[in-house]
A protein has these predicted regions:
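A short, N-terminal "cap"/entry segment at the start of jelly-roll beta-barrel domains
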Residues: 1-67
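A short beta-strand-loop-beta hairpin characteristic of the jelly-roll/cupin
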Residues: 79-110
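Short basic alpha-helical hairpin corresponding to helix-turn-helix/winged-helix-like nucleic-acid-binding
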Residues: 58-65, 69-81, 92-94
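Conserved metal-binding segment of the jelly-roll/cupin
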Residues: 106-128
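Short acidic (Asp/Glu) patches
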Residues: 59-63, 98-102, 119-122
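A short hydrophobic beta-strand segment most commonly corresponding to one strand
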Residues: 116, 130-148
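Residues at beta-strand starts and edge strands
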Residues: 49, 74, 90-92, 133-136
Length: 148
């Protein structure tokens, strides 16, 4: 831990997201985790959220990452295109689902998009149908509590 009054907020050896349960994507392809790290209550008792940053370079294999799931906290998902001349151009086609069973809805996204998934609402899978340019996928878990 870093020294000083605020050293407890500087986590120099954070967890890797791929080391967490249900996050081993070693057999998957089409994306990379650029320095993806995870801070939780074990490392910083005051940390109440997490942040995932993933560059999508190609269609993911398997295509449904992650599958349909829910959690007891809200999540924000950002899909950001990498066209410097048109930031609203996603550079591909992404399929996103919310709800399950008869309430399930699917959305086809081709522009930079922000998504809010309320606590408990089933969502996913996130399917990258086409990737023409890298797509930045950011997920933020809000007020996650003890969830891992």
């Amino acid at each position: 831990m870093a020294a000083g009054k605020y050293g407890k907020y500087i986590i120099e050896d954070p967890k890797l997201v791929t080391d967490l349960a249900n996050h081993n994507f070693s057999s998957a392809s089409g994306f990379t985790y650029p320095d993806e790290v995870y801070i939780d209550k074990e490392l910083c008792p005051e940390a109440g959220s997490w942040l995932d940053i993933v560059w999508i370079w190609d269609k993911t294999i398997p295509p449904e990452l992650p599958g349909l799931h829910s959690h007891p906290f809200a999540e924000i998902v950002l899909l950001i295109g990498s066209n410097p001349r048109d930031l609203r151009d996603l550079g591909g086609e992404v399929e996103w689902g919310m709800g399950e069973g008869e309430d399930a809805e699917r959305f086809i996204l081709t522009g930079t998009t922000a998504i809010y998934a309320p606590p408990g609402l089933p969502h996913g899978p996130l399917i990258f149908n086409r990737v023409d340019r890298p797509i930045l996928n950011i997920a933020i878990g809000l007020n996650t509590g003890d969830y891992v």
